[in-house]
Curated annotation (Swiss-Prot):
Enzyme Commission number, as recorded: 1.1.1.85
Cofactor binding note: Binds 1 Mg(2+) or Mn(2+) ion per subunit.
Main location: cytoplasm
Keyword Flavoprotein among record annotations: no
UniProt cross-references to SMART domains, sorted A to Z: Iso_dh (SM01329)
Keywords: Amino-acid biosynthesis, Branched-chain amino acid biosynthesis, Cytoplasm, Leucine biosynthesis, Magnesium, Manganese, Metal-binding, NAD, Oxidoreductase
Gene: leuB
Organism domain of life: Bacteria
SUPFAM superfamilies the UniProt entry points to: Isocitrate/Isopropylmalate dehydrogenase-like
Pathway: Amino-acid biosynthesis; L-leucine biosynthesis; L-leucine from 3-methyl-2-oxobutanoate: step 3/4
Binding-site list for substrate: R91, R101, R129, D223
One of the GO BP terms on file: L-leucine biosynthetic process
Quaternary context: Homodimer.
Protein name: 3-isopropylmalate dehydrogenase
């Protein structure tokens, strides 16, 4: 039986994950779903954001459905005990190196975007972000007395940006394969003009391209990519980039769509086992109010069905149900436009179930 680890986390995580679970149960499939604490909830229950039992469950499961972690009240904890360390730990222990962040603007929601509707209506970008390398994980790092330079002897913070050839090759293959199934256009985003790491990145991606002649490859500096995402976002199909640039660009692309509350994400290992979560955070300011948008989490469950569980038809059912609900005019507050019906978290989940 397919086993899904359900990790709601903190803030609105419990509310939105409950709606995704409700939708999954409506499909008529037989899933074994087991829930465990993570993030701040893990710290409260077991003294660590990623308790051993939770990690064991995640390793045993076929897929992980994740909510969100984080709360201001944990900001004073040592870094290793903060809720955000849970997601970093899961990525590391499960070797989740490929992050898929779709940025889709449904025609019904074009008016909710801060951009002109004609710029974003019909937008469909997939950002493929490398998750386990780059400056976020490079060693050495820390705080020390500066060994040289104008301020030698002064305290300085330092990090190390690095990528190995195997890391670049495997994410490039994932991105080219994704592009081959879509519009056959891949844009590799780097900063090769000033960073040795990303000149190396560019060289390796160019070499991998030889295996995918049907895909059109372009290269773009990250500063220009940030501008072009605002100026002409529909020129992009699939974007591949490193950990830090992907972190920033995927959030920028998300806001083109009108609400980050609509956007799912997937983090995959080499065998397509994945962790699926909404692109947004735990939003502690609205937790418990029943107003959070559950659609990103519901669509994350659809991605789980498609990429890990091999049930593309069921994924299509969920995605089509979401489109139907939007066409019917149901909106949570974050995507509300004049003339639509405002609903809460549970009501939106119920509407998707009804559409199914």
């Amino acid at each position: 039986m397919t086993k899904i680890a359900v990790l709601p986390g903190d803030g609105i995580g419990t509310e939105i994950v409950a709606e995704a679970v409700k939708v999954l149960k409506t499909l008529g499939e037989t899933f074994e779903m087991e829930t465990a604490p993570v993030g701040g909830a893990g710290y409260e229950a077991k003294g660590h954001p990623l308790p051993e039992d939770t990690l064991k469950l995640a390793k045993e499961a076929d897929a992980i459905l994740f909510g969100a972690v984080g709360d201001w009240k944990y900001d004073t904890l040592p870094r290793e005990l903060r809720p955000e360390q849970a997601i970093l730990g899961l990525r590391k222990h499960l070797q989740l190196f490929a992050n898929f962040r779709p940025a889709i603007c449904y025609p019904e929601l074009a008016g909710a975007s801060s951009m002109k509707p004609e710029i974003v209506a019909g937008l469909d970008i997939l950002i493929v972000r490398e998750l386990t390398g780059d400056i976020y994980f490079g060693q050495p790092r820390g705080v020390r007395a500066a060994p040289d330079g104008l301020f030698a002897g002064a305290r300085e913070g330092f990090d190390t940006m690095r990528y190995s050839e195997p890391e670049i090759r495997r994410i490039a293959h994932v991105a080219f394969q994704a592009a081959a199934k879509r519009g056959k256009k891949l844009c590799s985003v780097d900063k090769a003009n000033v960073l040795e790491t990303f000149q190396f990145w560019k060289d390796i991606v160019t070499d991998v391209h030889k295996e995918y002649p049907e895909v059109e490859l372009s290269h773009m500096y990250v500063d220009n990519a940030a501008m072009q995402l605002v100026k002409a976002p529909k020129n992009f199909d699939v974007v591949v980039t490193g950990n830090m640039f992907g972190d920033i660009l995927s959030d920028e692309a998300a806001m083109l769509t009108g609400s980050i509350g609509m956007l799912p994400s997937a983090s995959l290992d080499a065998n397509n086992k994945g962790l699926y979560e909404p692109s947004h955070g735990s939003a502690p300011d609205i937790a418990g109010k029943g107003i959070a948008n559950p659609l990103a989490t519901i669509l994350s469950a659809a991605m789980m069905l498609r990429y890990t569980l091999g049930k593309a038809e069921q994924a299509d059912r969920i995605e089509n149900a979401v489109k139907k609900v939007l066409a019917q005019g149901y909106r949570t507050g974050d995507i509300l436009t004049p003339g639509c019906k405002q609903v809460g978290t549970v009501e939106m989940g119920d509407a998707v179930v009804a559409a199914l």
